[in-house]
């Protein structure tokens, strides 16, 4: 199957720098910010954004992991809702939580993320940052911070590769 590279490592770096600036501008600085990366690649994108925010604003933003497996609507065996689906060493109540994901597609993962967060805490605000928005939403969800809008056919797939997981950083469509 043919693959077409959309973003190389330098383009991804520039895109994440822009997203970091947009988050800071939207939040009027890094105060009260929390980044939660959706497993798996969203975690590393959140860490990269955290690093960029620290370079820009001099503040280390708390960053954590969000695993929405138990909240997905396509899984029938549910785990107890007492199990917290995120790992972060800070209180997220009354903070601006930014969910970070690699590809926004149907919106179902984001819906599960919202459920996972709101079952346990009450943030002041929740925003969504995504590297790629490919369209084809099934739910009324949109990203606040978008790296690239890449309209796709339903038969196409967007693949995000990151050094931390794949030993290569790029985004391609196949």
Curated annotation (Swiss-Prot):
Q: What are the alphabetically sorted keywords of the record?
A: Glycosyltransferase, RNA-binding, Transcription, Transcription regulation, Transcription termination, Transferase
Residue span of motif PRPP-binding:
97-109
Name the InterPro entries for this protein: PRibTrfase_dom, PRTase-like, PyrR, PyrR_bifunctional
Kindly state which reaction or reactions the protein catalyses.
UMP + diphosphate = 5-phospho-alpha-D-ribose 1-diphosphate + uracil
Q: What is its EC number?
A: 2.4.2.9
Please give the Pfam families that the UniProt record associates with this protein. Answer: Pribosyltran
Q: Which GO terms describe its biological process?
A: DNA-templated transcription termination
Q: Which Gene3D superfamilies match?
A: 3.40.50.2020
One GO molecular function term? uracil phosphoribosyltransferase activity
Q: In UniProt terms, what function does this protein have?
A: Regulates transcriptional attenuation of the pyrimidine nucleotide (pyr) operon by binding in a uridine-dependent manner to specific sites on pyr mRNA. This disrupts an antiterminator hairpin in the RNA and favors formation of a downstream transcription terminator, leading to a reduced expression of downstream genes.
Could you say which protein family the record assigns here?
Belongs to the purine/pyrimidine phosphoribosyltransferase family. PyrR subfamily.
What NCBIfam families does this protein's entry cite?
PRK05205.1-4, PRK05205.1-5
Q: How does it assemble?
A: Homodimer and homohexamer; in equilibrium.
Name it: Bifunctional protein PyrR
Originating organism: Macrococcus caseolyticus (strain JCSC5402)
